[in-house]
């Protein structure tokens, strides 16, 4: 699954797996030159049962419950013993969302492939899409009995969020001949998110006598002489992020001793924009303005913060064996941000 361990572990049925291993895997450059970089890169190795190789496997799950709960999933998998595979996973569920907000849902699609073209060229890649909508409505009424006077307060809140993401990666290796290797990789991601919230609160010095779930829609029916203050707040935010990364490496073994010359090029870019605003209105019923009306405090805020990051890296290395167990490596790296 092109490094997506979560997708593999959560979606592949356990009865398809014969072996599961986690180990530190050498990079293509380390395998070719025999020199370790010292960095740990753990990989998850899943092996399917032999009787399932060269077989198309499909699976569908449908679940419905009370409070409009649902869990729908479909899978198509194809595996071969040499590591080639093709998998498609689709899921739509609100099973794990605790709120009964009408639009709560999590939808996901995933496609993964690994293929070898003869003995010289191989490709691994995946594309994932995810949509998550989550909202909640709540209300509260509170009474406090104090020696200096009782206090009564109520609040109502509604919030919802919508997040989407698209992620993809591609890995390739080309064994040009016994002495030359070309490796390349790339990935990109796009993530837009939206959040909205509305809240109201009020305080009184006597019980308002209105059901707290309908208090703000019937606020005018509350006696004026017991009102202390009322606050209304609205906010909305949107953020959008893009990213991509690509890398390419060429390694050439110059002689039978293992003298190796390597060239690596990498480029990463990410950009995005965060935008938010909030509106607030607070009325003080016990504090009058110069005209004798209730005092009102208004607060309006707007924020916008664009972001951009770009980097390049070019590396050149030379590896020379010195004896059977010793290798000398000289490298030069140039980078910019």
Predicted region positions:
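Primarily recognizes Gram-negative and organellar outer-membrane beta-barrels
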Residues: 5-6, 24-72, 82-337
């Amino acid at each position: 699954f092109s490094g997506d361990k979560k997708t593999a572990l959560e979606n592949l049925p356990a009865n398809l797996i014969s072996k599961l291993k986690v180990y530190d895997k050498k990079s293509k450059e380390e395998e070719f030159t025999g020199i370790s970089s010292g960095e740990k890169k753990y990989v998850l190795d899943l092996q399917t049962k032999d009787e399932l190789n060269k077989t198309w496997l499909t699976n569908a799950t449908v679940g419905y419950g009370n409070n409009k709960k649902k869990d729908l999933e479909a899978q198509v998998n194809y595996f071969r013993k040499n590591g080639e595979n093709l998998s498609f996973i689709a899921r739509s569920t609100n099973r794990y969302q605790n709120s009964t907000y009408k639009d709560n849902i999590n939808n996901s699609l995933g496609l993964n492939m690994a293929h070898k073209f003869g003995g010289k060229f191989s490709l691994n890649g995946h594309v994932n899409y995810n949509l998550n909508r989550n909202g909640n409505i709540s209300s509260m009424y509170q009474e406090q009995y104090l020696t200096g006077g009782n206090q009564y307060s109520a609040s109502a809140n509604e919030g919802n969020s919508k997040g989407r993401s698209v992620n993809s990666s591609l890995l390739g290796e080309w064994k040009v001949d016994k002495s030359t290797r070309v490796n390349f990789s790339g990935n990109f991601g796009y993530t837009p998110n939206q959040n909205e919230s509305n809240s109201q609160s009020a305080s009184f010095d006597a019980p308002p006598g209105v059901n707290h779930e309908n208090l703000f829609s019937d606020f005018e029916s509350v006696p004026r002489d017991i009102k202390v203050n009322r606050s209304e707040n609205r906010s909305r935010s949107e953020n959008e992020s893009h990213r991509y990364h690509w890398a390419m490496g060429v390694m050439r073994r110059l002689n039978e001793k293992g003298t190796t010359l390597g060239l690596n090029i990498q480029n990463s870019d990410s950009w995005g924009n965060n935008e938010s605003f909030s509106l607030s209105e607070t009325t003080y019923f016990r504090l009058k303005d110069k005209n004798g009306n209730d005092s009102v405090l208004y607060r309006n805020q707007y924020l916008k913060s664009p972001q951009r990051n770009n980097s390049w890296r070019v590396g050149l290395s030379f590896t020379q064996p010195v004896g059977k167990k010793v290798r000398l490596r000289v490298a030069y790296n140039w980078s910019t941000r």
